[in-house]
Amino acid sequence: VKKMRKIYTGMVTGILVFSIVSLAAAPDHTHVVKEGLSHFNAWKSQGIEHGKALGLLKQYYVTAGMQVYSAGSDITVIGYGGKSVLLLHESGTWSASGFDSTLFGKPPGTPGGGGGGGGCGSPDTWPTSSSAILLDPFEWQGGVFHNPQLFNAIKSDLQSAGYSVSYYKNTQVTISLIETKLDKGVVFNRGHGGYDSSTRSVIICSGERWSENKYTTEQNNGWVIRAWIDHGGEYYDFFTYTPGLISNYYSDLPNSLIYMESCEGLRNSSMADAWLGAGAGAYMGWSKSVTVVYGDSTAEENFNDLCINGLSVCECVEKGYTSPYTGGKLKYEGTGTLGL
């Protein structure tokens, strides 16, 4: 056992020393991030457990001279002229996994909680617009991420309740679309999300690949940031929006229902507060990570209850939904008696 420990320690130390020496020549944010992710994959392929591999990755970035924040499997790294959030979920979830929150090098912060409160009853208020928009930015990933049956079911239920429905997928879900097309009575987003510990904010991925030369005003204000997701062992970076984007582009929403089928959409109320402050009636989301399959089945049941069975938001949530394996719970903020 001692011999194996020495081999393991030597392997990790060797990787770190070699990597830091190579980075010292020409430090670049993207290069440092990719090098770390490459080692993360290598550690996991060698049989190192996910949580331990995350720990090694955090130490790698700290040793590389970056500021590192951690919230479960969401790692925020800042340095060498850039910032990235790494959504290092395990297979089959909408990105985040794990529930601790740690900042390396500074005192840890304590994010706020999420969830609706107050009494619950039948619907007594509704969106003032009979339009709905459905967003599916990661349909291209295939497997469980490709689920046209879900969108057909939700579209049918919404149309039965009198809503006109538009649908956007993959690269159609741009930051420009998010800035201009979400003024609807219902907004449903099915995609990757996470938590940026450096700002204590929920973040939601678009379907648009990252570029330093686009949306520069949004970047400079922190309204969009760079987040990375894993697909088949490769990592891809996307424009990802923060609560600030919603607060700065919307102010008169039509008492909307915002439904986030994304990991950690209600880890705290930061994203919900932005939507509600912009005029939304209620915001539904998951407190932790959620498996794609369970998130899909819950969303399909919720929209059937809201549109066909006449339930309110709080009545849906009170049925009690907890994601297998992750413990994520469906919650809401805002007006629980909002109906569709």
Task: Give the ranges of each region predicted by the language model.
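Structural alpha-beta junctions
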Residues: 63, 155-167, 277-286
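Structured catalytic cores of large enzymes
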Residues: 64-131, 206
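Cysteine protease catalytic core and zymogen-processing segment of caspase-like enzymes
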Residues: 196-285
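Beta-strand-enriched, solvent-exposed domains that form extended recognition/catalytic surfaces
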Residues: 28-63, 67-74
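A domain-level signal for caspase-like cysteine endopeptidase catalytic cores
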Residues: 35-36, 41-44, 52-55, 103-216, ...
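Active-site-proximal C-terminal subdomain of hydrolase catalytic domains
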Residues: 256-340
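Secretory targeting signatures
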Residues: 1-27, 187, 249-250, 275, ...
